[in-house]
């Protein structure tokens, strides 16, 4: 492993290196290379590797080797767990990109990956009420949909690391911000 190797970019998780990796020297369980970045987010698989590097996540090797997912297929907005429901309108390749080649994010409850413009959004990170002030009009409908009577209260009490966390997304097509509220 060449330490000067370019880190892979995760277009659906642009802040992955701050949020989902830690600087730990070790050997990747998947590729066997000495690495300095270890994934510390969710990975749903039978066998739990101790050390996954960003390269094995980005090229799909980690998901394939361990038959795992970083985000569950049905946790992507627009995908129904019910086989009787119509199939998702989002392209299968984009759904696989989220499940198999994009780092997940840690949450209290099962993580949810929001969509917009017929594609998965980019996860920007965790947001508190102050982070959301400039984009309140954009994200209020998402909160109101889940908490019709308490939307303003919820928005006022969101924090980056408390019991009510805002998970902020942005559409890669139109730039619209979306918000999922994760409850501890």
Give the role of each language-model region.
Residues 4-184:
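Preference for intrinsically disordered or flexible, low-complexity segments
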